[in-house]
From Swiss-Prot:
Keywords, ordered alphabetically: ATP synthesis, ATP-binding, Cell inner membrane, Cell membrane, CF(1), Hydrogen ion transport, Ion transport, Membrane, Nucleotide-binding, Translocase, Transport
Localization per Swiss-Prot or TrEMBL: Cell inner membrane
PANTHER family: ATP SYNTHASE, ATP SYNTHASE SUBUNIT BETA, MITOCHONDRIAL
Topology in membrane: Peripheral membrane protein
Name recorded for this polypeptide: ATP synthase subunit beta
The protein's assembly and partners: F-type ATPases have 2 components, CF(1) - the catalytic core - and CF(0) - the membrane proton channel. CF(1) has five subunits: alpha(3), beta(3), gamma(1), delta(1), epsilon(1). CF(0) has three main subunits: a(1), b(2) and c(9-12). The alpha and beta chains form an alternating ring which encloses part of the gamma chain. CF(1) is attached to CF(0) by a central stalk formed by the gamma and epsilon chains, while a peripheral stalk is formed by the delta and b chains.
A Pfam family of this chain: ATP-synt_ab_N
Family: Belongs to the ATPase alpha/beta chains family.
Keyword Transcription attached: no
Membrane-crossing residue ranges in chain numbering: none
Residues noted as binding ATP in the record, renumbered to the chain: 148-155
Function in brief: Produces ATP from ADP in the presence of a proton gradient across the membrane. The catalytic sites are hosted primarily by the beta subunits.
Organism: Xylella fastidiosa (strain M12)
Its EC number(s): 7.1.2.2
């Protein structure tokens, strides 16, 4: 058993001295005698000294305490016993429901599947949210980013996606809360409980109040649990299709920045860690589908100061299949979900994948919205009366499209009092195609606001004129 002693403690950083001929590997977990604290080796400084990051508070630690090398990385429980439970970064239960019964324990540092093991599918994943299904469709086994500044609805959108997909998909989900509000974690737990889908969700939380080491590693803990479900073959000889929700990827980067500064690395652009791209790659490359099973990941990405060129969101962009950009200006109009249809994109936007009708409808909707955007300056200066009849018609349709993108959410029922709506993809395409074809030019634009399918628009318009 390899033992060393603590020689220095600076906040979350602990230096431990081991015999020179038996230094622990980087990422090995160290246990400290008499405490529940786990240290993770980050650097080997020479002379037998390793620099570690503490996963937990270092209060009460002192020099010369004995640290034991476990000989492996941090391990967490995996298997069906994790479903319906809330765990911390080390896999300890934090929901006061007794110990977790686990099938196995896996290390959180793992290699991504090899290139020949990976599989890509082009099957669409219906979300029931009109603007997403039409403008930036999701792929099963793909990666989706929800980009947005503070308070534009990333978490609410993610909750609705979980509500819609987890129920319809009826597969397994893993939720990793990375550096977010504890209140949101609590709300999420009760939301899942009330929806009766708790037995299909494993939750891993490392919230805002926890040390940077916990927040940096909690995403890997959640991912490891998801990988087990994907890779472990059931009676049919196949793994499972898993949904992995990460809220919030930016906090993962931020925790890496804090750890990097504590380790004394020279910061790069805007104060981020020099290893930003590598750290992001380590996480994202493991989120993939194999011939055995798939991981579909939906990640909330906080955009600092609404600047999409900030290194953190910019690095995340390259790993994603679909990007859903939430806009403050659209939220200011009272249109929720505040998705910017011209700024959101998807690799699935191909007629061979989504079909001719869907593709053509989306293109026409984009053209109409772009035309309205181009005319906004003229309208602001000269007013609507100076526009040609064609332009007036385009503006009228664009405003109807904008309002038809709004939709009442199931998870927001408690706040709005309006029952949530799930709109199938076929209904969505039919509704928007009819608007751009001019079938509803005679209806007032208010009738298109906060409804489900196009039939509800007609019903609302009839009530308004009655």
């Amino acid at each position: 058993m390899n033992q060393g002693k603590i020689v220095q403690i600076i906040g979350a950083i602990v230096d431990v001295e081991f015999p020179r001929n038996n230094v622990p590997k980087v990422y090995n977990a160290l246990k400290i005698d008499g405490t529940a604290i786990i240290l993770e080796v980050q650097q080997q400084l020479g002379d037998g000294i390793v620099r570690t990051i503490a996963l937990g508070s270092t209060d009460g630690l002192k020099r010369n305490l004995i640290a034991t090398d476990t000989g492996h990385a941090i391990t967490v429980p995996v298997g069906t016993g994790t479903l319906g439970r809330i765990m911390d970064v080390l896999g300890n239960p934090i929901d006061e429901a007794g110990p977790i019964t686990y099938t196995d324990q896996w290390e959180i540092h793992r290699n991504a599947p090899s290139y020949e093991d990976q599989a890509s599918t082009t099957e669409l994943l219906e979300t029931g949210i009109k603007v997403i299904d039409l403008m930036c469709p999701f792929a099963k086994g793909g990666k989706v980013g929800l980009f947005g500044g503070a308070g534009v609805g990333k978490t609410v959108n993610m909750m609705e996606l979980i509500n819609n997909i987890a129920k319809a998909h009826s597969g397994l989900s893993v939720f990793a809360g990375v550096g977010e509000r504890t209140r949101e974690g609590n709300d999420f737990y009760h939301e899942m409980k009330d929806s009766n889908v708790l037995d299909k969700v494993a939750m891993v939380y490392g919230q805002m109040n926890e040390p940077p080491g916990n927040r940096l590693r909690v995403a890997l803990t959640g991912l490891t649990i998801a990988e087990y479900f994907r890779d472990e073959k059931d009676s049919s000889g196949k793994g499972k299709d898993v949904l992995l929700f990460i809220d919030n990827i930016y906090r993962y980067t931020l925790a890496g920045t804090e750890v990097s500064a504590l380790l004394g690395r020279m910061p790069s652009a805007v104060g981020y860690q020099p290893t930003l791209a590598e750290e992001m790659g380590v996480l994202q490359e493991r989120i993939t589908s194999t011939a055995n099973g798939s991981i579909t990941s939906i990640q909330a990405v906080y955009v600092p100061a609404d600047d999409l060129t900030d290194p953190s969101p910019a690095t995340t962009f390259g790993h994603l299949d679909s990007t859903v950009t939430l806009s403050r200006s659209i939220a200011a109009l009272g249109i929720y979900p505040a998705v910017d249809p011209l700024d959101s994109s998807s690799r699935q936007m191909d007629p061979l994948i989504i079909g001719e009708e869907h593709y053509n409808t989306t293109q026409r909707v984009q053209q109409t919205l772009q035309k309205y955007k181009d005319l906004k300056d003229i309208i602001a200066i000269l007013g609507m009366d100076e526009l040609s009849e064609d332009d007036k018609l385009a503006v009228s349709r664009a405003r109807k499209i904008e309002r038809f993108f709004s939709q009442p959410f199931h998870v927001a029922e408690v706040f709005t009092g309006a029952p949530g709506k799930y709109v199938p993809l076929k209904e969505t395409i039919r509704g928007f195609k009819a608007i751009v074809d001019g079938e509803y030019d005679h209806l007032p634009e208010q009738a298109f606001y906060m409804v489900g399918n196009i039939e509800e628009v007609i019903e609302k318009a009839n009530k308004m004129t009655a």
